UniProtKB/Swiss-Prot annotation:
Name of the protein in its database record: Teichoic acids export ATP-binding protein TagH
PANTHER family: TEICHOIC ACIDS EXPORT ATP-BINDING PROTEIN TAGH
Membrane topology: Peripheral membrane protein
Pfam families registered for this protein in UniProt: ABC_tran (PF00005)
Main location per the UniProt record: membrane
Reaction equations catalysed: ATP + H2O + teichoic acidSide 1 = ADP + phosphate + teichoic acidSide 2
Record-stated family: Belongs to the ABC transporter superfamily. Teichoic acids exporter (TC 3.A.1.104.1) family.
Residues noted as binding ATP in the record, renumbered to the chain: G57, I58, N59, G60, S61, G62, K63, S64
Functional summary from the UniProt entry: Part of the ABC transporter complex TagGH involved in teichoic acids export. Responsible for energy coupling to the transport system.
A GO molecular function held by the record: ATP hydrolysis activity
Subcellular location per the Swiss-Prot or TrEMBL entry: Cell membrane
Length: 264
């Protein structure tokens, strides 16, 4: 089985500045130390053709950072990501321009993805039909609801037939019927042997479509393996976490995040 995505020791750091003075010092003072946040820390995993990998973890764990890196919109501070094939990222608002109409966004986004105008003209009716936006396709996207934006973004990306698909909470908004249609399309891609990364807090969807689970906690890969090996462990953790008081949940998050801040 061929490797489609190989992630090796990936780290993503963000320098934290309290004011512009600290930012300036970081530029002009050699070896100036400042607080640094590790969004991801030494994370490695390999995805093969046909893998549908669920990226799970509580909010702020690093799932979206990882999905953006796989998609290529973020670069790692350290480490390397190799991709074998075209990647398409589906996230709410991803790549959409609020000033443009829906149909203008289709052309703009597909031009950015390397499609010719002839290809775009051919695919546009299919995208509009899948989106179910009707006459709203001619309205500015800034007037769309979050569900409508998700429909447009999903329809563009799913119709371009990528080799690797990254879905980041794009099915968490919008109506249930459209979400099911999207899941049916994802299942088609799964049957075709495409590689899919699926970020969701909906454990029912994760269990139904994923073959493997990557559990991310505090920017690190806590567990990675087959669905039936990892998901029950994560669901047990999640149930225990939800039983805690808001204060206990906040303390748990703060304790995790404290390990992600260093001065360097």
């Amino acid at each position: 089985m061929n490797v489609s995505v190989n992630i090796e020791h990936v780290t993503k750091e963000y320098r934290i500045y309290r004011n512009n003075k600290e930012r300036l010092k970081d530029v002009i003072v050699p070896f100036h130390k400042n607080k640094t946040f590790y969004a991801l820390n030494d994370l490695s995993l390999t995805a093969y053709e046909g893998d549908v990998i669920g990226l799970v973890g509580i909010n702020g764990s690093g799932k979206s950072t990882l999905s953006n890196m796989i998609g290529g919109s973020l670069s790692p501070t350290e480490g390397d990501i190799k991709r074998d094939g075209d990647v398409s990222v589906i996230a709410i608002n991803a790549g959409l321009n609020g000033q443009l109409t829906g149909i203008e966004n289709i052309e703009f986004k597909m031009l950015c993805m390397g499609f010719t105008r002839k290809q775009i003209k051919k695919l546009t009716p299919e995208i509009i039909e899948f989106s179910e936006l009707g006459e709203f396709i001619y309205q500015p996207v800034k007037k769309y609801s979050s569900g409508m934006r998700a429909k447009l973004g999903f329809s563009i990306n799913i119709t371009t037939n990528p080799d690797i698909l990254v879905i980041d909470e794009a099915l968490s908004v919008g109506d249930q019927t459209f979400a099911q249609k999207c899941l049916d399309k994802i299942f088609e891609y799964k049957e075709q042997g495409k590689t899919i990364f699926f970020v969701s807090h909906n454990m029912k969807q994760v269990r139904e479509f994923c073959t493997k689970i990557a559990w991310i906690e505090a920017g690190k890969l806590k567990q990675f393996g087959e669905l039936d090996d990892v998901l029950p462990e994560y669901e047990k953790f999640l149930n225990d976490f939800k039983k805690r008081s808001k204060g206990e949940q906040k303390k748990f998050r703060n304790d995790l995040d404290s390990s992600r801040f260093v001065v360097k």
